[in-house]
Every structure is written in structure tokens, then in C-alpha cells.
Amino acid sequence: MAGFIGKERHAIDEKGRLMIPARFRRKFESVTVEGVADAFSGLYIMKAPDRSLELYEPLIWAGMRKSLSGLSDFNPEERLLKTLMYESLEMVELDRQGRVALSREFLDHAGITKDVVIIGADTKMIIWDPQRLAALLQESADRFASLAGRYF
């Protein structure tokens, strides 16, 4: 199945809930992962270093978790990475209306007060405060060609 593709603008309600776009929710309808119930109910949300939020479906997070669990607790850098990743992570439930509740800690991290831009980035959804995203795109506009040339 195709990954998350596209961009949508949504608002956070007064209780800190975010509506997940219907086209992204459809991707969850048949998710089954070892250790996760057949009926999808949650996503994994992470505070990203660039001050955005990233939402992962259980199948993708399971792969990341497997990679993290392979790291050594006795290697200081690997242990630090595990600590930083898990400190930045929460599981959020999807309610019947297709919303997830975002904690104040996560909203503050991303500078989100009301509106958000949700970007489908194949294996994850990236959630941005619209002003922060606009600033990033403005600052990075001249780097796009060189980045694309380097990686494609």
C-alpha cells in the first residue's frame, strides 16, 4: 500500500485534539502487527529535533523499535540514542472521530497553538506549526536543488 502522501491544514481543538486526515486514516484500516490488536487504535508520536512532531503507525514503529532494541545499553552513544528517542515518544489513541489528543508538552515543543500543517512523508506524518514550516521552507528554498542532486 502507498505511504502517506500530501499536505493538509487542520486546527487543534480546545482539548488539544488533532483530526487525522481521512486519506491518512484509511491506511490504518487493515494494520496488523505482532503484539498490536487487529483493530487499529493508536499511533506513535515523537518530538522531532527540528521542532516538528512525527506520527508513526504501529507497523512502522515496530521496525524502528526493533532497531532500537538491538542497540547496546553498555555503549554510551547507543544508550543515549535510546534515551533520547524514548523520552520523545508517546502512544496516542485514535478516537471514533479520527482524532488524537496531543499533550501540552508536545504542543509546546512544536510551537503549536491552533493550526497545524500535516505532511504525509511516506512512512510517517510530520506535523508543523504553519509559521515554523513557512520559515523553514523560506530559509531552505535555495538548498532544495543541491539536496535533491545529492540524494537523487
Swiss-Prot record:
It is found in: Cytoplasm, Nucleoid. The keyword Transcription regulation applies. One of its GO terms (molecular function) is transcription cis-regulatory region binding. Keywords: Cytoplasm, DNA-binding, Repeat, Transcription, Transcription regulation. GO terms for biological process: negative regulation of DNA-templated transcription initiation. Its main location: cytoplasm. Pfam families: MraZ. Gene3D superfamilies: Transcriptional regulator MraZ domain. One of its GO terms (cellular component) is nucleoid. It comes from the Bacteria. Residues 7-51, 89-132 form the SpoVT-AbrB domain. Disulfide bonds: none annotated. Belongs to the MraZ family. This is Transcriptional regulator MraZ. It comes from Pelodictyon phaeoclathratiforme (strain DSM 5477 / BU-1).
